Amino acid sequence: MSNRELRVGLVGAGLMGSDHATRIHRRISGASLVAVGDPDLERAERAAAGIEGCQVETDPLKVIEASDVDAVVLATPGRTHEPLLLAAIERGIPVLCEKPLTPDSKSSLRVVEAEVAAGRRLVQVGFMRRFDPEYAELKRTLHAGALGRPLLMHCAHRNASAPPGFTSQMMIFDSVVHEFDTTRWLLGEEITAVSVRHPRSTANAPSGMTDPQLVTIETASGVLVTVEIFVNCGFGYQVRCEAVCEGGTAQVGGDSGMTTHVRGAWGGSVAPDFRPRFQQAFDEELQRWADAARAGGIDGASAWDGCAAAAACEAGVAAQTSGARTPVQLVERPGLYA
C-alpha cells in the first residue's frame, strides 16, 4: 500500500470530524477521503460535499468494513469507540481515534488486548499536542537535560465556554485527559495519583458544575504537575505548560501573533477555540498518521497511551467526588508497547 494513495474512511462528521474531512481533502498528501459515516445523513453529506467519489453512510460500521477503505479516522463520541475500534482491529486496518480511546480503563484495556492478540499496533489516539511545534520543542529540551531534572510542571487549560450538557466529569475526561497524556509523554513516566481541589466557582458555570478546578498529578519519580482547568473563562482558548527543572524553566503556550499599540493601549487577540491554536498540530498529526498508515502502522500515541490516560481520568473523577488523593490503577504495560 505504501506506493499508492491511502483511501481514508471518516466515522463521525461533527465539529472535529468535519474539520478532519476538510483537512484530509485539502492538506494531507498521499491520502484521499473516500467515505464518511454518521448516523445523521445530512451531517455526513455536508462533510463529504465537494469531494468527488466520497460515499456517505449512516452506519459507521459499513465505512470500517468497506473494501475500498484502507484506514479510518474515528471522530465519534467516546462512548461509541470500543466496537468501532474492535472492528477496525479485526479488519487489520490502521485507525486514528480522537480522544478518548474509550470512556473507561476497562473498555480501553479490551482494545489493548485486541491489538495484542492481533500482534500489531493499529490504533493511534489523537493527542495532537505531541505534534505541536512548541510542545515538541519542550519535549526535546527536557530530553536533552540542559535544564536538569524536571521537578514541577504548571499547566493551564482554558475554554471560553463549555457546550451544553458539559459536566464536571467531562472536565476530566474531555479536557484534562490532554494534560494526562502530555505529562506522560513529556516526562516519560507513568502517573501514580491524582487529586482535585475546588476553588470558588465562576458565576458563568452551569448549575451543578464547579469551575475552575485545580488538578494535581503525581508521577512515578515524584514530579508534581498542577493543572488549572477552566472551561468557562469567557475570554477565549488558552493552553499553557511550564516545566520547572533543577537548572531552569521552560514554558510553552504563551501569547503570540500580532499586537497593536493604539490610543495609549496595547493588545492582541486570543484564539476563540482549539482549532486555530492547534491547526498546525492537527495537520502534522494527520500527515504523519497517513504516511505511517500507508505502511500499515501508526506514528503517535498508541492504544496503551490511551488506556493509561483513561486510568488517570478515572482517578481524577474519583478525586473530584471524594476530595482525596486517588491512586491510578494501571495494569502492567504489554510487551507490544515496550
Swiss-Prot record:
InterPro entries: Gfo-Idh-MocA_inositol_DH, Gfo/Idh/MocA-like_OxRdtase_N, GFO_IDH_MocA-like_dom, MI/DCI_dehydrogenase, NAD(P)-bd_dom_sf. GO terms for molecular function: inositol 2-dehydrogenase (NAD+) activity; nucleotide binding. It catalyses: myo-inositol + NAD(+) = scyllo-inosose + NADH + H(+). Transmembrane segments: none annotated. Gene3D superfamilies: Dihydrodipicolinate Reductase, domain 2, NAD(P)-binding Rossmann-like Domain. The keyword Oxidoreductase applies. GO terms for biological process: inositol catabolic process. It comes from the Bacteria. Its EC number is 1.1.1.18. Keywords: NAD, Oxidoreductase. Homotetramer. Belongs to the Gfo/Idh/MocA family. Involved in the oxidation of myo-inositol (MI) to 2-keto-myo-inositol (2KMI or 2-inosose). This is Inositol 2-dehydrogenase 4.
